[in-house]
Structures are given as structure tokens and as C-alpha cells.
Amino acid sequence: MVHPVQVGKRTRMSFSRLKEVGQMPNLIEVQLDSYDWFLKEGLQEVFDDINPIQDYTGNLNLEFVGYKLDLDSIKYSVEECKERDSTYAAPLKVKVRLLNKETGEIKEQEVFMGDFPLMTEQGTFIINGAERVIVSQLVRSPGVYYDMTVDKTGSKLFSATVIPNRGAWLEYETDSNNIIYVRIDKTRKLPITILARALGYGTDAEIIEFFGEDERLKATIEKDNTKTREEALLEIYKRLRPGEPPTVDSAESLIESLFFDAKRYDLSRVGRYKFNKKLAIHLRITNQIADQDIVNPQTGEILVQKGEKIDKDKAIEIQNCGINEVYIKIDDKSFKVIGNHFVDIHSLISFDISDLNIKEYVFYPVLKEILDNYADEESIKEEIRKNIYRLIPKHIIREDIYATINYELGLSYDIGYKDDIDHLGNRRLRSVGELLQNQFRIGLSRMERVVKERMTIQDQEVITPQALINIRPVAASIKEFFGSSQLSQFMDQTNPLSELTHKRRLSALGPGGLSRERAGFEVRDVHHSHYGRMCPIETPEGPNIGLINSLATFAKVNEYGFIETPYRRIDPKNKRATNDIVYMTADEEDLYVIARSDEPIDENGYFIDDKVTVRAKEEVLVVPVSEVEYMDISPRQLVSVATAMIPFLENDDASRALMGSNMQRQAVPLLKPQAPIVGTGIEYKAATDSGVLPKAKNAGTVAYVSADEIRVRRDSDGGIDKYKLLKFKRSNQGTCINQRPIVSKGEVVAKETLLADGPSTDLGEIALGKNILMGFITWEGYNYEDAMLISEQLVREDVFTSIHIEEYEAEARDTKLGPEEITRDIPNVGEEALKDIDERGIIRIGAEVRSGDILVGKVTPKGETELTAEERLLRAIFGEKAREVRDTSLRVPHGEAGIIVDVKIFTRENGDELPPGVNKLVRCYIAQKRKISVGDKMAGRHGNKGVISRVLPEEDMPFLPDGRPLQICLNPLGVPSRMNIGQVLEVHLGLAASKLGWHIATPVFDGAIESDIVDCLRKAGYSEDGKTVLYDGRTGEPFDNRVTVGYMYILKLAHLVDDKIHARSTGPYSLVTQQPLGGKAQFGGQRFGEMEVWALEAYGAAHTLQEILTVKSDDVVGRVKTYEAIVKGENIPEPGVPESFKVLIKELQALCLDVKVLNDDNQEIKLKESVDEDADELEVNIEGTENQLEDKEEKEEEKEKEENYQEDSNEYDDLREEDVEPDLEELSLDDLDLDDFGDEH
């Protein structure tokens, strides 16, 4: 039944029935742990890979001995970095040793390797003052993948791909004649026997003896025209290096370097783990019948007799005693199974080797060699350490390739299984650490080339490590990654939830991933292995659907990058649910039968029912209790954080729940946050982990509290911890970040206690919207098509008011004609316009500004003409005449207004780092209070979104019997067809809870049910169906039917009408077509498109049509004359020829077509060729205006580039691949700057 639960400082009444076992992990540990691994181990791995760098003679040796991040010499704190546009980073210092083998001389130096960006405690990076997030990438794991297709005759064709982390791919395929081919590194296919010969089995007999008798193998040998190893090597060489003279030596070294050289072929730890898992012999011989006696080679005992079935334990024992070939009987045929000869080292060594830290299988022949030659513990350990790269090779080895071929042969006998590439056991995460490591590796390998060159050029006697190392390529590759990688994204900071979700995002796009165009349905689909790992609900709508996902609430990422989810172990003896929690990857989970978390169990953990609903791979079954092995840990483990915040999610349709999850991330922080009456209980955890709230670093007592600082006296040593609170700062998205203390002086706080509320949080719980009294009722058609009718009270009482802060900057640069100057003295500007400008020429804080007002007065020198001798003389005698300057002040853009809240000034003199050529930089921050207004977008948490259509006076709104007017009216028709019934249940429960004074927690899949809601309504004294008589506010008459009324949690979304409304009379024009630009950012016009033209044609409005296509668009002369005529009140002149028509003719002429324009009498009409002729006709100087337009366009473009954040916050691929390299087809004429082609355009 309903019971109180303490959430931070608030008590919620919870309807959950299940006891939660196990804690939810820290929600941003994906980021923190990964970066931590990179600093501790990842960097070292890269240095180990590259050590040592030798010159071409092999005399000089350069080694990286160790490194440290100098955390004491960080220049600025996180806040200062944001203010100064700098990067939050620490210097990386590496200890380098140079050995000269001839002289035996060793030089050691500490070399500075550039500033390395550091992760903040919130899991973000500050790059050039902007807060960015590195999104984790979902990629195919390295490994061996088998696939099967059925051809038109119905025979099964098997294919395989061997994918390394980096290096050459091997692809196997079978054709309908049963011949197996191989492609090496995407080249043309060869019969697979050629590869086998080249690797060492030269003759037909050797191949058949090694791989066993097989029809497909014989067919392939017949097709193969080589007969010896040498011929096979030459054949492969010809395919891979066409045009070069083939020799056996060069062919051998080619294959060696292609596959067996760790520098060029890297499996990575994951690859080795997946190879050993897939190719291990024990999986393929389990439950098969042995065709020969299997004898342990060490002891000689018979493990399995001929004709006996091999069970799982025996199979593992067979593998671990070093047997790599087993004959099994399939349909009266004998088949030889070959493994890759890796064994579990712990089964072969009796003493403790945990200090060696070997978790993987090891290569048996090397281990056997060590065990045969050494006997005592110490020397065996020493040898294992020395030979670790031979025991666990980083590259593929011959045995691996033989095992893959054998697996391919075995599939046609149903030995082994094919793989599903969309299974999360075959997809892994590359998080920050690994992405950074790969980038650092690229930088180091570029540096290695430079070092080698310098070693040969410089004098070997006086050479030093410092002189050899050039850190540029390393620093550049790191900078490039953070600045422009597709996975380094401008953080979505609209509210704390969007911040948290962005850090937990998983993207299949990006370098080495998929591209939107190529991704099919299968990759985007929900897969059974997503359960508890990736949210099946939260993903963007649109072209990225299913490619961008969110991590589930309880999921963790293991050392190999696979996502794991926790399960409770069921005691195998008495079938009791224990509190042991096991984290499992997707392929481990497939081996077990797992019960649901809401399966009824008694207080001792025993199942109440005899039959239990379980998941087994992709099936949902009902099985007896005896078969259950694990149990889910919590009902919300399968969804992400945002989805887990939707109450009654179980009663919503999936597509609406998807919209609900996505829209919560777009909720704007309001002036007074209010936690939801009906919550799900995860709000507190989400807010504390999102990183927007200050927490106590140590336990202690609050000593001082003010609006912008909290001091806590530590219990441990009596020292003081200071916490600065952020006041009215601008977020990345222009919303307002403001923190308010929630502790009082003298309060005792434990470690990790919340000290203050941030944006959109209320007592430490995420509070994205407001609890609003609403009813499902239509009102005079004002809620047609999802529109919303709201009460004036919401405007008057600032219920949905939010603060938005915009940043504008002006810089004074050096120009060719002299420096720009920031000054109050601006030409042709009256005193009225300068009333709020101080003596420096900068607006004062607190001033109220409207669009067009000056923020920073700035003048730029104009070009001066050459002076005559007389003028120069006069100038010298009477002093400087006023210099020619033009006004380039920073003004408030169209449609913006507000109050100046902050001004920051950066100058060279104060030692601020400014870009070259900039002398002074001024930033102004304008804050706006935006009340809710018609046209704003609002939404509930169930995907029920709408636009405000009318603000009604409070007295006209429908009212309840007790006289309270509704605050919002929603259309009842928005519910049934969309099937998001959760909103109705939320409204009923909200009604009862507000009367009872409760805050409620109804967790997803484990919340209040219908009977609970009825009980609450009854307890609160309302009717059980939650409906009430409503009265019309205008007449006082009751409406005909009773209406569902209650409290719904409603959000105001970031799509505000103030940002979208826009109007233009005249403005900038595109350079080539001379048509008005489009879009609000360019101050563009509304496009009168093809279909609109048809409409006017159909209507017969010829003059209107002609006007729209000429003087209102691209008839250059006509539009100037028309404007003049309107101003002077004259008649509008005849339209001329549109510029786009001239462009069309030019394009046709460019295709070598002679195009002439003729009149009725077949006389050629001369079109004006250039803009200059137009100018002559108008007697104006067009040059200046065009340049100004270009300046303006350039500035707009720069600003857009800086903000490279797409408005639709569902899609975070800031820099899409298309933006990086424009396709030639996509370059339209608009992109060409015709000024580069001289005057004759």
C-alpha cells in the first residue's frame, strides 16, 4: 500500500510494491570512469605501443619512460576558463630517454607535450570557453562474424568476416558451387586454399590432412590453380600489389607485415577476447559424439572414449589440457574440429599467479615451452612476464586463421552458430577515454615520423630528446578532436535533465561508425539484447532514429566496452532470490533464464507461484520455478533516466512516450521551479548526478549562508570549505543558471549533501514544469488540433515566466587603415541614442535596451584619398583634420530587447589572451523575462504537446464548484487516438494528492494502479471517476456533462514564439541570384515557392504574380525604383528583367548553348550584362552596399559556426560529415563568391 519515502528534504508517498535491491550507479560514471582509465592506463598503453623509436641505422633509441599531468600548474579554474574563452587543461610532461648504442650514452629529459584538456567533475570539457561533451560511440566489436544466406536453389551459403581493431580484414564467402573464397583487405577474391598454402600448408595433401576430408574443401582445391606454397605467395602478392615485380621474399614479408606485425595489425584486448570466445574448441564440441578416443597429452588418461557424448565440463577440460583437434561424428561422417589453441592459464599452473593480472586465455604452445623448460615458481613467473606478448598476442596468429577456416567448414554440419551483428554482445562502446586514446595515438605516430627524420639529419653526438621531439602533431590532433570531431558536441544545457542525458548518450554515428544514409532498419531497431542496457524509448524522431540512443538507468560499461546490466542471483539449491547482484553482458545473459522483477516473492525471497514468466534470449516464456536462474533487479532497469521520469509510462503508447522523453529535455527552467506532485521517485537521483547542484565535499556544519556563497566548517579538522553559487549565468542554450541555498546556518550536513538548488530543481529534485489545474474540455474551438487555452492568471502571476540571457560581443581590431576604436564619440548619432553609454563607449549595467540600440560604440577608419602638397602643408600647420571614420557600433539585433545584466571587457593591456589582430573585446549580456504568450509551445510528460492559442481572462475560464477557475483547458480528443492514457491517470492522482497535501512517487512499471487511484480520490472526498461539474465562466451555467479535472505537470518548451517571430521589409540579398536571403538569422524574406506561384496563376492574379517575381524579389533596378516610388508617393514603375533570368542564360551559355532573347518582331533584346550598368542607370554606387552586406553575412556565418548547435535538440551531430567536405554537386552558385572572378561577373 502507499507508504512514505524520504527523498532528500522532501517526503513522497510511494506506491511501489517492490523492494529495490542494489543501488543505481552514479549516472555519469560512463564519462568519469572512462577518462580516469585514460589518464591512468590509456596514455601509458599508447606510449608502450610506440616505444622505442629507432633511427634507420638502429643506433639511436628514443623511449618514453613515464608521464605526469601537472595538475598544480592549471592556469585558470573552470569558471575562469568559461569567462576568458580558454581551455581547461593541464600541461602533460613526459620523461624521455635517448640511448646512443655506439657510445652507450644515455640522456634523460622531461619534455612538455602540450596542454591536455581535463574533464570537469561534471563529466564535461571546457574548450575555448564552451562546455562540451564527448558522446560515447557504439561500434562493431572486433572479432569473427559468421553469416548465412540461402541461394535460389535452397542451399545454405556461409560467409565470414574477420574484423580487427585496426589492420587488414579477411572475408570468407561460399559460392553456389561450394567453393570457398577469401578476400584479403577488400581486394578481389581468391580460393581460400591459396591463403592456407601461403600460411604454411603448401600441398593438397597437407591441406586435406590438416583440415580433414570435406566436400567444399575438395571443390576449392580443384578451383585453385596453385600447387605449392611459393606459387600461392606470388598469387597473393600479385593481387595485393599489382604492377610490382613479385618475388617470394617480398610476398612473405608482405603477409608477415599485413597480419603478424603488432604495429600494423591490432586486435585490441576486446578483439583477442572475442576471438578466443568464438574460436575456442570447447563450444563446438559440447554435446557432440567423439569419433576417436580423446587422450590427455600430459597424463595419457583417456578423457572421452570413442562414441561417447562430450558434456560441457569435459569439453572445457579437453581445451585446457592443450588439445586443439578433436574428431566428432556427424551423420556417420567424421569431422575434425580445430580450435585456436588458447587455454585458461589457471588450469595448467598450480600456484597463485594473481599478481601477473592475466584475465585472458593464453597461447598454449608458448606456455608449454615455458613449463617444459622451467620448474620453480619464480622463474616461471619471470618467463611469463617476459613473454606476455607471445602468450597474449595483440595481432592475429596463424592458429586463429586456421580456426576461422575450420569454423566456416563446420557451419555446414551445424557445428557452431552464426552471429547477429545487432546484438549488444557484438557492439561495444567507445567512450571518452578510448576515443581520446585513438586520437593521441594518431598524433604520436605522426610525431614518430618527424623524430626518425630528425635522428638521421642531426649530429648524433650533441642530439637531445628535446630537439628530436616536435609536439605540434600531438597537440593538433587533440585540438582537432575536441574542436571538430562529430562526437565532441556543444553541451545541451537547456535544463539539468538535458545535460545528464547528453552525457549518457550513445551514438552509432561518427568516425568509424555508421552514416545516416547507409544505416538500414535492422541497426535502428529495438533488439532483445537492449534490455537493461539501452533505452527502447528514448531516441530522436527523424533521420537519426535508432542511431542515437540513451544508456539505461542501471547499466554499466565493462573493461571491454560492453554494456552490462545487473541481475539478482537465484540460489540454485532452494530457488530463493538472493541479494547477490551480478552484472552481465548481453552474450552472458543469453545463457540464462531470467525472471521479471515484479514476479511475486515472499519476504524470504521464495517465489509465490509455481510457474514464472521469464525471458530466455528473445523469447518470453512461462516456466516452472526450478528452471529460473536470475531475476531482474528493478522494473525501471530497462529504460533511461528521462523515460523513467514519466509517471504511468506503462499506460502510454511507445511513440508518445518517446516524444515525452525528448520534450522533457527541452523544458525551459522557470522563475520559480516546482517539483511535480505526481513524480516517479527518480527526480532526486537525476538532479544530484547531473552536476548542476553543489554538494558538500566533506561532512560538517554550515557556518555562513548568503545568496552567492555557502561556507561549511569541516568536522575533521575545523577548516572551512567555501562554495560559490552561480548567479544568473548564461547556459549554452541561453537559459538562465541560478543557484539558491537550501541549507541554513548551523545546519549539520553529511558528505555529498545538497547545499543549493540550481536551475529547474526544487529541494534537490528535478522540477522542469509546474503543477497546473486543468480540465479536458473543448472551449469555443480554441483547443482545436492540440491548441491550448490558458488563463491570464498564468501570465499575471509569472507561473510560466523564464529568464533568457543572450550574449553579444564587439571586438576592436587592427585594420589596414588603422585600428578600430571603442568610443562614445560616434558620427551622426544624437545624444538621445547615447543616454545609457558611459564615457568608455560601453552601455551601463542595468540599462533597458530595445532593438537597434547601441551596446558598444565603435568607429572604423575609412579609406583616405591621397593628399595634395598644399593640403599636406595646411594639415601640418593647423593640425589633424577630423579623421574619416564610419560607425560600426554593436547594436541590439532585430526582435531582441531586455536589460543589461553584465558587461565584460578584455584588453591586451590587462594581459587577457585575445586572438591576433584584436585589441579589445567587449561582451554584453542582455536578460529577458519572457512571460508565457500566444504561440509558445507547451507539453505534458506523455508526449501531449500543443501551442497556446489564446490567453483568456481568469473570470471567463470554466470554474469548479468551489469557485476555483481552471488554469488550462486541453482538448479531450487529444487522448483516445494517441493512446497516452498515462496523462489521465496522472490528472486523477494529482487531483487527490493536491487535496491530501501529498507529493507522490509512482515508479514506472511499479506504480499506482486503478484501485490505488480510486482509493486516493475517495480519501480526498472526490467522486471515484475523477469527474466534476464545471461551470462556464462567462454565463455561470454548468456545462452539460461532468468533466475530468485535476493537476497535470506541464512544461514550457524551448520553442518560444519570441525566437521565431520575424518580419522583413527590405534587407540583404543573395549575391548571385539577387533574391532575398531566407531565415530569421539572415533577416530573410518568406519564400513564395513553386506551389504558391501556381495558386496565383490559377487565380489569374497576373499583376500580383509579376510583382512578386520581379520587383519584390530579384529585379535589381526595379526594386530600388519601386522603393523610391513608394517613399515619394509616385506610381510604381514597370518591372524589369529578373536577375535569376540572367543567371539562367549565363548557365545555358556555360553549356555552350547560344541563347538570345527575342521580342515579338524577332529582334534581339540586349540584356544589361553587369551590375555596373544597373548602377549607371540608377546613378548609385552599389559597391559600398554590397560590401556591407558581405560583412554582415560573414559575421552572421561566424556567429552560426561558433554556435554550431542545431536548434532541434534531438539531434546533436553539430558537424555533420557533409559540412566538413562539401560535395561538388552540392555547391550551388550561391556559394561562389563572384568577386573573385574580377569585374565581369
From Swiss-Prot:
It is an enzyme of class 2 (transferase). It catalyses: RNA(n) + a ribonucleoside 5'-triphosphate = RNA(n+1) + diphosphate. Keywords: DNA-directed RNA polymerase, Nucleotidyltransferase, Transcription, Transferase. Residues 1171-1241 are annotated as: Disordered. GO terms for molecular function: DNA binding; DNA-directed RNA polymerase activity; ribonucleoside binding. GO terms for cellular component: DNA-directed RNA polymerase complex. It comes from the Bacteria. Residues 1171-1180, 1191-1241 have a biased composition (Acidic residues). SUPFAM superfamilies: beta and beta-prime subunits of DNA dependent RNA-polymerase (SSF64484). GO terms for biological process: DNA-templated transcription. Its EC number is 2.7.7.6. PROSITE patterns: RNA_POL_BETA. HAMAP family: RNApol_bact_RpoB. DNA-dependent RNA polymerase catalyzes the transcription of DNA into RNA using the four ribonucleoside triphosphates as substrates. The RNAP catalytic core consists of 2 alpha, 1 beta, 1 beta' and 1 omega subunit. When a sigma factor is associated with the core the holoenzyme is formed, which can initiate transcription. Belongs to the RNA polymerase beta chain family. This is DNA-directed RNA polymerase subunit beta. The lineage of its organism: Bacteria, Bacillati, Bacillota, Clostridia, Eubacteriales. The gene is rpoB.
